[in-house]
Amino acid sequence: MKTLLEVSNLTSDDIESIFNLTIQYFNNTNLNHNILTGKVIVNLFFESSTRTLSSFEIAEKSLGAHSITLNINTSSINKGESIIDTISNIDAMNPDLIIIRSQYSQFIKKISEYLPSCSIINAGDGHHEHPTQALTDYCTIRYIKKDINNLNISICGDILHSRVARSNIRLLSRYGANISLVAPPTLSCNLTGISHIYHNLIEGIRNADVIMLLRLQKERIINCVIPSEQEYSHLYMLNHEKLLHAKKDVIVMHPGPTNKGIEISNNVAEKNSVILLQVKMGVAARKAILHYLLYNKSI
């Protein structure tokens, strides 16, 4: 496997291999620091990122690769060059891998079809997919809960605009998770692989093993679909009182960035979540993915 565009690209063997590598990198941050020596990886992020870009850069450099992040603001795109031409020119320089984030759904898949010999990782495209975040979340849940099968997983928030929700649903449902969506009617959608849709947070997280919170993606909301952030937080913010309706050993997750006071209270974020563990797992997972795509040998 040389390209990762969406969760469906992954076989069960791929996922198991990436999980095993991830846990090894999670437990030993100094593992295999020269395994990608001589490899050239280019990061092209046409949309803002903190965790995904930083974790990829750390993973690349930790494994010995030459890591190049193109500054979009100073690139020739500002001189009128198209994004496709920019990527074509980067590909002509013969890097081993290009990691792309785009605000346009399915755009990265079109790039892959246009440049079939180019190895690409999708680092998030519009509201379509975010496969490396789904792998991070899969590894986090499995690390803590040991098994995905029959877990009650509630994904709460702006489902309509979330690529993280879509990738997680596609991945976790393959392993027997019972997935519920919790969102206002205007931010919900019926996706393959879910068990229930709720519009009440307490009902939606009752008996949950995992709660995955999502922020309001204001940059993608074209028309006003909620009365106000204040009303949204009153109805859908996870606080300590609402959290009591989930299982006692529930894990609270969030892919970031968090908007504390809107979808999650400060108290829950600081004391009851595994958000920072997810961030650490994200570096390990991206090391594992790079290892698997570019080296593809066991440790």
Swiss-Prot record:
Catalytic activity, EC: 2.1.3.2
Database matches in PANTHER family: ASPARTATE CARBAMOYLTRANSFERASE (PTHR45753:SF6), ORNITHINE CARBAMOYLTRANSFERASE, MITOCHONDRIAL (PTHR45753)
HAMAP family registered for this protein in UniProt: Asp_carb_tr (MF_00001)
Protein species of origin: Ehrlichia chaffeensis (strain ATCC CRL-10679 / Arkansas)
Superkingdom as given in the UniProt entry: Bacteria
Alphabetically ordered keywords of this record: Pyrimidine biosynthesis, Transferase
Protein name: Aspartate carbamoyltransferase catalytic subunit
Subunit record text: Heterododecamer (2C3:3R2) of six catalytic PyrB chains organized as two trimers (C3), and six regulatory PyrI chains organized as three dimers (R2).
